[in-house]
Amino acid sequence: MTLTIYNTLTRRQEPLETVEPGKVKMYCCGVTVYDYCHLGHARSYIVWDTIRRYLIWRGFGVKYIQNFTDIDDKILNRAKEQGLTMAEVSNRFIDAYFADIRRLNVLDADEYPRVTEHIPEIHQLIQILEEKGLAYAVGGDVYYRVERFPSYGKLSGRELEQMQAGASGRVDAEDSEPKKQHPFDFALWKAAKPGEPAWDSPWGAGRPGWHIECSAMIRSKLGATIDIHGGGGDLIFPHHENEIAQSEAAMNQPLARYWTHNGMVMVNGQKMSKSLGNFITIRELLDGVGSWKEDPVNPMAVRLFVLQAHYRKPLDFTEEAIATAENSWKTLKEGLLFGYQYGEKLGWGQESAIIPELATRFQELGDDDFNFSGGLAVLFELAKELRREGNILVHEGTTKTPSDELQRQWNTLVTLAKILGLEAKLDDETQTQAGLSDTDIEALIEQRQAARKNKNFSESDRIRNELQAQGVTLIDSPQGTRWHRS
């Protein structure tokens, strides 16, 4: 089987052929650290974490780099608002990033370079561009000459002439800067402003522009050409377009073989924004505070919610969708905990074999542009089967499926789920899909049987309805009452 990836640059799905066989150099644009991470960040970093995990499972050695932008106007504005230094704001929200994203079971990147730690590398790259005639200095600022890069616009599918004509004077403040030779020239270095942090440079004191930062850090950490460059679809233009222009003009090599972009997160069909009052941070969602007025959401349910849709498609966050993800996680969790609950009783040993046919199905889906939403179907088949067998074991003391086959099913489920970052904690063992333990359910059934014996049918119906509302179905027979989780 061949692993194929959709490449934004070529607009087609292509076989993964890395610069160095068996190894993947991967970079994803990180956060600008001036606020807490929101649902859009959650999706991006869950997606790239899962892609990384999958590549490792497929046998690749992966080096994954994700930066922190720790110098930016938004950071400076936040620092002024709160009477803090830029570094204090950056460090605070870098710590918050790790606290939030690790709760979603996102593995740490191999390195997290910071812009402020790579000023010399940024200077060097700008100087290369200047020597090649692709950059020019004006009054302490340095700009990139977009007209000198013939393929500018190739990632976003735009042509410079069309962009210029379409602008019709509606360019932003930076674009309209009179010192620029072309409206779409962009800043590589910005002259210092009073009261703002600045670094010495060959062009005078100042700080780097946004786009040059990633180009310099990629070159420093991964070399001239990487295999996969990831990021949100909103970064295609201008950020990733400008990265290509800088890096490829300087190095005369492709910056990345594959450009991959995840889709946007919508909230109730609308773009998430503070002005619309639908801006939700990761910690608000997980803790049930702030903008999220409902109960706290299980981190694994958030991860499952993200993975249920193909990574390139838009994802609409609604209360109904997250509730469905919560219920789906409870089902999956029951399957993942099956071995911990019943393995000893079933006499399981240390065997870790998995079912090859199911692993092959999962891989075929993953190899098709990381179709993890399809791969989830394999997991749920196993989880539901294990849940049924668990219910039978509780009621009858044995299982219909042979013990060794159940162990292979469970091993397969745990192995494949871990590739997607879906893991159940041992302290979740007594929890069930309905939020009731087996003992709780059995106790309610005994109360119902007593009510029926006393002809208190309204109480009997109440208990049945209560259990049904929590996902437990009762089956009455002459031999007694059986139950299963629906």
From Swiss-Prot:
Pfam families the UniProt entry points to: CysS_C (PF23493), DALR_2 (PF09190), tRNA-synt_1e (PF01406)
Cofactor: Zn(2+)
CDD domains: CysRS_core
UniProt: ATP binding residues: K274
Annotated catalysed reactions: tRNA(Cys) + L-cysteine + ATP = L-cysteinyl-tRNA(Cys) + AMP + diphosphate
GO cellular component, one term: cytosol
Top-rank EC class of the record's enzyme: ligase
Highest taxon of source: Bacteria
GO MF: ATP binding; cysteine-tRNA ligase activity; zinc ion binding
InterPro entries for the chain: Cys-tRNA-ligase, Cys-tRNA-synt_Ia_DALR, Cys-tRNA/MSH_ligase, CysS_C, Rossmann-like_a/b/a_fold, tRNA-synt_1_cat_dom, tRNAsynth_Ia_anticodon-bd
Protein name in the entry: Cysteine--tRNA ligase
Organism: Nostoc sp. (strain PCC 7120 / SAG 25.82 / UTEX 2576)
Recorded name of the encoding gene: cysS
